């Protein structure tokens, strides 16, 4: 996976299975497959960071649930694994650097979490 800062939302494409576009008053961001990153942003990329892998919390998360992501991030932080998180209406997607992915999955499984790539 790739995380990009892009110049504008113009011509950003939603091709691919996992694409997130973020817009604030300060920036536009794109998260997508590294393979697709060149075609997703069509020359709009200002800065990018490759080498992420993604897992999601299995199941639909009710908005009344509290602390799920905080607990997951605490487990990973205690083991010095940085995260980048994006969310949809149904669930959260956690990105970790590829070299930490297997260890992160093992730590979360040992803590009883059901996550899927």
Which residues make up each language-model segment?
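Regulatory modules associated with amino-acid/nitrogen control
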Residues: 1-77, 82, 103-117
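A generic structural motif
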Residues: 28-32, 91-97
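A short glycine-rich beta-strand->turn/loop micro-motif centered on a GG-aromatic cluster
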Residues: 82-90
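Short low-complexity, flexible loop/linker segments enriched in glycine and/or proline
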Residues: 99-101
């Amino acid at each position: 996976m790739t995380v990009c800062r892009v110049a504008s939302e113009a011509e950003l494409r939603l091709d691919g299975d996992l694409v997130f576009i973020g817009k604030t008053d300060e920036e536009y961001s794109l998260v997508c497959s590294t393979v697709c990153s060149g075609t997703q942003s069509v020359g709009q990329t200002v800065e990018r960071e490759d080498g992420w892998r993604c897992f999601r919390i299995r199941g639909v998360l009710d908005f009344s649930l509290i602390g799920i992501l905080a607990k997951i991030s605490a487990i990973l932080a205690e083991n010095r694994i940085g995260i980048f998180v994006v969310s949809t209406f149904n669930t959260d997607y956690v990105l970790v650097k590829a070299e930490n992915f297997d260890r992160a999955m093992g730590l979360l499984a040992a803590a009883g979490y059901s996550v899927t790539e």
